Amino acid sequence: MEIKRFGRIREVIPLPPLTEIQVESYRRALQADVPPEKRENVGIQAAFRETFPIEEEDKGKGGLVLDFLEYRLGEPPFPQDECREKDLTYQAPLYARLQLIHKDTGLIKEDEVFLGHIPLMTEDGSFIINGADRVIVSQIHRSPGVYFTPDPARPGRYIASIIPLPKRGPWIDLEVEPNGVVSMKVNKRKFPLVLLLRVLGYDQETLARELGAYGELVQGLMDESVFAMRPEEALIRLFTLLRPGDPPKRDKAVAYVYGLIADPRRYDLGEAGRYKAEEKLGIRLSGRTLARFEDGEFKDEVFLPTLRYLFALTAGVPGHEVDDIDHLGNRRIRTVGELMTDQFRVGLARLARGVRERMLMGSEDSLTPAKLVNSRPLEAAIREFFSRSQLSQFKDETNPLSSLRHKRRISALGPGGLTRERAGFDVRDVHRTHYGRICPVETPEGANIGLITSLAAYARVDELGFIRTPYRRVVGGVVTDEVVYMTATEEDRYTIAQANTPLEGNRIAAERVVARRKGEPVIVSPEEVEFMDVSPKQVFSVNTNLIPFLEHDDANRALMGSNMQTQAVPLIRAQAPVVMTGLEERVVRDSLAALYAEEDGEVAKVDGNRIVVRYEDGRLVEYPLRRFYRSNQGTALDQRPRVVVGQRVRKGDLLADGPASENGFLALGQNVLVAIMPFDGYNFEDAIVISEELLKRDFYTSIHIERYEIEARDTKLGPERITRDIPHLSEAALRDLDEEGVVRIGAEVKPGDILVGRTSFKGESEPTPEERLLRSIFGEKARDVKDTSLRVPPGEGGIVVRTVRLRRGDPGVELKPGVREVVRVYVAQKRKLQVGDKLANRHGNKGVVAKILPVEDMPHLPDGTPVDVILNPLGVPSRMNLGQILETHLGLAGYFLGQRYISPIFDGAKEPEIKELLAQAFEVYFGKRKGEGFGVDKREVEVLRRAEKLGLVTPGKPPEEQLKELFLQGKVVLYDGRTGEPIEGPIVVGQMFIMKLYHMVEDKMHARSTGPYSLITQQPLGGKAQFGGQRFGEMEVWALEAYGAAHTLQEMLTLKSDDIEGRNAAYEAIIKGEDVPEPSVPESFRVLVKELQALALDVQTLDEKDNPVDIFEGLASKR
């Protein structure tokens, strides 16, 4: 099929790798492929360097020191697929070469020590933890550094905040009090800052010289009593203020203040914080702490420059500004590598504590590095992070786009981040610095709106964690191909033009150019422009970039469209959209859903499970295909070959399509012929009418795979057994089980069918001596077993596609205590579209299938072509997502011309271009009608008369030209399939790309007759998962009361709910065919009475003569 490209803007640079934020970050943290001597001091290398050397605390023993030399990662013990099957973590063993040095003797012992396992990242940027694919979401937080913000309580006054990395030191606030004293707040304690300045060695003259320009502000520092002290005395005074309960000793005070501001192990601004502080205050720092401790004295790094800036800001000196905390220059991203390293550092600190304890306990001669180190705390910290952290999430792999989006997510929640309740509007809002860095459209709709966002398409995260976006340099009105990646702070210094600025060659064509400076729009001459956007795509995320004609959609609906694409279910017959945006191929390639040739060669063999390619150098390389693999969401991940034997392939050519891809293009739905018109009220309120033909052609059929699992345990009564030998079952019930009792692959199973046979021992009394004798003679046969087999739950079923058995003792299998074996059965279902399923397009138009019409009842074109889907026109104007109309028009042209289109966002097909294509399409459409011997039908002419009155066509023109005029508006005359008469007015018809979403009615349908009850209240449980009932709540009771339906109401509140005695009697009566007896007292009433009695309230039931009556009589015996 021919693909026609629109767009005038040249691609200057390709998109960066879409999973780079994950893959690069983790690679940098592990540095597994870098030789030890060449490793940078980042990631786990930095964590080792910070934690070691570990010195013995008891200095009297001569002193042991454990030092770190280098680390290495071993090979993972199991491949990825085996980890998924056996519930293992895909990880590599970590070894460190350590040295134990005896200080007094100079003896050195060296050892390689095993430090546990570290999970490895798969090629696509996810992890396999306990058999499940997971993604670590990047976190956005306020960058460490020095910030100046207005004091909310006092206008004209400011607070300086010094912020370290999370959990690496205290926040420190400096402010000028109403009485003029400059105070410092740390760990919720306030004291005069002058005290700390004296500790740091400043005297009156120095402060007067450094800050003399700010006259009266400096007076707040000049406390004579403080300057009269020596720095050591000021230190002890400071210590007593901060730790009032501790004895004021010099060494204690030095240790405390050192830990607070100068110890690199306990206080850390991080590289980003150091950079931000230097940039803000215009200084150079020697390290990442606030002060140094040299020769027994504290030396200042940050406090005086911060104070100088605070005074200048208060005095209104030009060039000093408050900070906007939502500016992306002040927020940074913590990617996987950093998050994991933080946990690794915590684990190492625990490990070091254990080493110090062992140094004190053991005899020095017998100690070796291996004996000192216990790797458990480190391994536990890493495992905790990957399996339980709020940022470690179950991977969304509904389709390739969802998994890609999940890896590009940015969350402000999580440890050290915000909470939903605390986050206000400002944090959630779109900020001007989001331009080209964070997508302004894609975010969830609920409580997390604005807190969870997505990285923009071209954005990259630098080493310091700031998001950079690319710009082309402009010199003297000429746009060069030099591309510069800039942070939000750097960008504020320049004048930047938009990507769609008209160019002649490389020179800016316009005399006045719309540009932006610090986020504000300005109109400038070409010579003033310093940079230019690289592409209109750079503003939005990958998902939003997949919406054609995005510029014609309201942002609220574009948000829904972006989010719903990730919920699209991969279909059996996937189709790439007729109207694409140009990113479809990149998404499939970077998500690793499809298979591509790694070198040039020729296809040697193709079958359903593998493709073999003979490379130019004669090597045969096999590419195994993933067939019907169950995703985390239960959709089928399936790869299908797209090459034939003997075909030549180049490096990077497509070998096999993955789920939701067609010839390497993302294919989340189907192109269907849509009519936008009301239809007898069936498409009221966003409901959708579809043609039965879609079901016949399997257009919206998807495969879903459910996993069922059963364990065989050792119980007190004896071991459970997986077996075919199940008591009281007919041979028919067992026909699909193999001799071991597991269902065979290929069997069709329905609700209630056995998937795995299992027997468990019944509880019984102590056997008599005779029984014991019989048992010893005849074996266990004599004991009673009950059937506890795994059966297909209600409303489910399908074809068994795979079974897995894990037995204790098999290599790599780790089962829970008491479990002997686990059997898993995978059952696949083919689901056709049905009433109640949710459909949506890319523009946020979503609805539920309300009616499936026979194809002969659908409206049809004059040539007899029936439409596939009828959408309600009222769904468009108020939602303001007109992109779908333009897509439909362009789709109409594509339908008759047999073309596909690439229409990039903000640079796509314009109205005249669409009209030109529609004119060509009309020639094909009308030419075909004429060729078949019928021109304009007289009933069509009636519709055209009506169109004239509406001003849609030029009066007096020949009907054929009027039809063409309508066609250029994307409208045609449609006929009602039921009556054969034309529909009154012209109707918009065309191809629209529509997806089936993951919310399928089959997963939500549920009915209960008899089922489980809650233990305390004895009322039926709720929810499909518990096989629960429908709650008959307070308002429903009012409804029955209003109608006076007393018997129905009584039945609802007793027999059908928690009247134990009554429901058992009713069950019996129904079986025997007798009348249902009167209900007795509900159990919840008994619970209420018992609770009141527990509160020492004597609740009694009295008859008319005031004699006590036990209304619960008989209830206790039934319990």
UniProtKB/Swiss-Prot annotation:
One GO process term, biological-process aspect: DNA-templated transcription
Coiled-coil annotated spans: none
GO MF assignments: DNA binding; DNA-directed RNA polymerase activity; ribonucleoside binding
Pfam families (alphabetical): RNA_pol_Rpb2_1 (PF04563), RNA_pol_Rpb2_2 (PF04561), RNA_pol_Rpb2_3 (PF04565), RNA_pol_Rpb2_45 (PF10385), RNA_pol_Rpb2_6 (PF00562), RNA_pol_Rpb2_7 (PF04560)
Keyword flag Transport: no
Catalytic activity: RNA(n) + a ribonucleoside 5'-triphosphate = RNA(n+1) + diphosphate
UniProt-listed InterPro entries: DNA-dir_RNA_pol_bsu_ext_1_sf, DNA-dir_RNA_pol_bsu_external_1, DNA-dir_RNA_pol_su2, DNA-dir_RNAP_su2_dom, DNA-dir_RNAP_su2_hyb_sf, RNA_pol_bsu_bac, RNA_pol_bsu_CS, RNA_pol_bsu_protrusion
CDD domains, alphabetized: RNA_pol_B_RPB2 (cd00653)
Annotated PROSITE patterns: RNA_POL_BETA
Keywords noted in UniProt: DNA-directed RNA polymerase, Nucleotidyltransferase, Transcription, Transferase
Functional note: DNA-dependent RNA polymerase catalyzes the transcription of DNA into RNA using the four ribonucleoside triphosphates as substrates.
Family the UniProt entry places it in: Belongs to the RNA polymerase beta chain family.
Protein's UniProt name: DNA-directed RNA polymerase subunit beta
Species for this entry: Thermus thermophilus (strain ATCC BAA-163 / DSM 7039 / HB27)
